Amino acid sequence: MSRAAGSTETLKNRFRTDYCGLLNPEVEHQSVKLGGWVHRKRDHGGLIFIDLRDHTGICQIVIQPEEQQLFAKAEQLHLESVICIEGTVVRRSPGAVNPRIPSGEIEVVAAGISVESSAHPLPFPVADEVQTSEELRLKYRFIDLRRDKIHENIIFRSRLTAAIRRYLEEKSFIEIQTPILTSSSPEGARDFLVPSRLHPGKFYALPQAPQQFKQLLMVSGFPRYFQIAPCFRDEDARADRSPGEFYQLDMEMAFIEQDDLFEILEGMFSHLTGSMSTKRIREFPFPRISFRDVMNRYGTDKPDLRIPLEISDVTHLFLQSSFKVFAANTKEGCCVKAMLVKGRGNESRLFYDKAEKRAKELGSGGLAYIQFREDGPKGPLVKFLSGEELAALRELLGVEVGDVVFFGAGKWEQTCRIMGGMRTYFSDLFTLDRDELAFCWVVDFPMYEYNEDQKKIDFSHNPFSMPQGEMDALESMPPLNILAYQYDIVCNGIELSSGAIRNHRPDIMYKAFEIAGYTKEDVDSRFGHMIEAFKLGAPPHGGIAPGLDRLVMILRDEQNIREVIAFPMNQQAQDLMMGSPSEVTPIQLRELHLQVELPKKAEAKP
C-alpha cells in the first residue's frame, strides 16, 4: 500500500504547496514548497542529496555546490530534522530513475531550506528499519510511527474504519455513541473502575462492551446500530489481544434472524477484502459449521481451514477391540479420534518424539501412531490391533503407503482439543497460503454445559442468547441437548467475534436462568433494568462485534496486535511513553475519599 494513495488535497501556505510522494513529471519545471523529515542524506561528488519524507512518501532533493550558503546549511542537517524546502521540479536522468518510489522520476533542485526543528541523535534509526527492542519502540512510539511499515498500518486502519462506516451507512445503520462511564458487572473479565468524587464509596466502570446499551437501543426503536467502540478489560496481554483497551465494530439489528446478520457481515468482509486488500476469500458464502462438528473435525471452535488435516471419529471401529485403552473409551461421553497425515510415515524417530512431547504439553498421556510403510504397519500401537481393525482403519481414512495416523482417546471434549492442538502443531508441515482468508461461521453452540466442579448445570457461553426452540425447548428437552442462537466468526484460526440472537422475552429468560440454578429474585437483582426494559416492548434482535484490531492484523499480515495500534501498552499493561499507570497525589486521593493499601511485597520495594 502506498502512503500516497488517496492523498490528493494540499493546503498551500508558507510551509508547503505540495506533498513529497505526489510529485511526478506532470509538474516538471514548477516551483514547489515541501515540508517533511530528513529521511536520508548523501554527499555524492559535490552534490548533496536529501530524501525528504512526509506522510505521502519520499522525494529526492538536490543541493548544488554553487549555492554555497544552502550547501553549508544542508551539510549541517541531522537525520529526522524537520525542514521546509523551496525548489524546482526536474526530471531525473534515465539512469537515475528510482522505480521503488512514486516520485522516482523526478527530483527537486533546492533554492531554499528552512530548518523548523533540528533533531538530536535518535534512539533508533527510522530509515533503516533495524531490529529494535519492543521496549524502546514503545517508549519512543512517536519515532517508531515514522517507520514505513507501522505508519502504513495506521493509515490502513484509518481507511478501513472509514470504509466500514460507508458500507454500514449504505445498509441503513445508525452510528450512536454509548457511555464510557457505566456500572460495574460481576460477569466477564475484570472491570477498570473509576471512583466517583461526587458519590463517595461508589465507582463507575469503563465498559467491557456496550452490550446492554446496544440492546436498549433496539428497545428504543433504532432498527440498526453500529459504533467503532472502545472497550476496556483488565486482562493479560496476548499476541492478538491488547491489555486494557481495544476497539470493536459493535453492531445490533432489530427484527432479524441469524441468517440476516450473516448476510450483512459476509457482504461487508467481502467488500473490505476486495477493495482494500490483495487477499482473497476462500469460500463465499462463508461455510457454517456446528460446534459439535467443528470440534469433531478440527478439535477447536476456532479452526484454521487452510490446514489440510481433519480429525476423524473412529470410536465405532474399536467397540469390541482387545486393545483396552481404545475399548474403554467407546462408552458414552468418550471417543477415539484419528488424524491422517499424508506422506509422513517414514519420518525419523525424532519427528515422532517431538510430536509426542507436544501432545503431552496439551494434556495427553502420550501419542499413539501407526506408520503405514512398504513392509507393513509399524509403530507402538500395531501389536495391540487386529488385522481387521487395521484394514477398517485403512478403508475409513483412505490410508496409503507412506502415511501415518495419529490417535487420541478419552473424554470427548478433552480428546478433541488435544487432537486439535496436534493439528495446529502439524500445520508447520504445510505452506499455508497467507493471501487466502478462510472465513467460517461456528454455529449451534450448546446452551448449557455440566460444571464438573460444582456438579451442576451452567450456561456454556452467553446466558442472554435465545435458545433454539425458545420456551418449548427449555420445557421439554434435556438441558445439555438445548442449542442456542450463538455464533462465532473465525478467519484463519482467529476468532474475530462472537454474537447471538438475543433473548428478548422475560418469561424465557427467567426459565433459562432457572435451569442454571438461578431464582427469579437472582435474575431481577442482577439484570432488573434489562428485564424491565424487555417488559415494556422489546423487538427480536441480535448482533455481533468483530474486533477491529484483529481484522487489521489479518488484512495486514501482522502477528502482533501492537503493530496495528498507534499507542499500545506493553504486555504488562504499561504505557512506556506516557509513564502510565502512575501514582497520584495524596490530594487527589483525598478528593476521591480513597486510601491506597499496597500489598506487602510492593511495600518492601525501595
From Swiss-Prot:
Cited InterPro entries: Aa-tRNA-synt_II, aa-tRNA-synth_II, aa-tRNA-synth_II/BPL/LPL, Asp-tRNA-ligase_1, Asp-tRNA-ligase_1_N, Asp/Asn-tRNA-synth_IIb, AspRS_core, GAD-like_sf
Domain of life where this protein originates: Bacteria
Cellular component annotations (GO), alphabetically ordered: cytoplasm
Swiss-Prot/TrEMBL site (Important for tRNA non-discrimination) positions: 44, 95
Claim: Nucleotide-binding is one of the keywords in the record: yes
Top class in the EC scheme: ligase
Entry's Gene Ontology BP terms: aspartyl-tRNA aminoacylation
Chain intervals for the UniProt region annotation (Aspartate): 211-214
Assigned keywords, A-Z: Aminoacyl-tRNA synthetase, ATP-binding, Cytoplasm, Ligase, Nucleotide-binding, Protein biosynthesis
Swiss-Prot/TrEMBL catalytic activity: tRNA(Asx) + L-aspartate + ATP = L-aspartyl-tRNA(Asx) + AMP + diphosphate
Enzyme Commission code: 6.1.1.23
GO MF annotation, one: nucleic acid binding
Major localisation: cytoplasm
Binding-site list for ATP: 233-235, 495, 547-550
Subcellular location: Cytoplasm
Pfam families, A to Z: GAD, tRNA-synt_2, tRNA_anti-codon
Amino-acid positions noted as binding L-aspartate in the UniProt annotation, renumbered to this chain: 187, 233, 461, 502
NCBIfam families, per database record: aspS_bact, PRK00476.1
HAMAP family referenced in this protein's UniProt entry, alphabetically: Asp_tRNA_synth_type1 (MF_00044)
Family: Belongs to the class-II aminoacyl-tRNA synthetase family. Type 1 subfamily.
Subunit structure: Homodimer.
Function, as annotated: Aspartyl-tRNA synthetase with relaxed tRNA specificity since it is able to aspartylate not only its cognate tRNA(Asp) but also tRNA(Asn). Reaction proceeds in two steps: L-aspartate is first activated by ATP to form Asp-AMP and then transferred to the acceptor end of tRNA(Asp/Asn).
PANTHER family recorded: ASPARTATE--TRNA LIGASE, MITOCHONDRIAL, ASPARTYL/LYSYL-TRNA SYNTHETASE
Protein name: Aspartate--tRNA(Asp/Asn) ligase
Source organism of this protein record: Chlorobium phaeobacteroides (strain DSM 266 / SMG 266 / 2430)
Species classification: Bacteria, Pseudomonadati, Chlorobiota, Chlorobiia, Chlorobiales
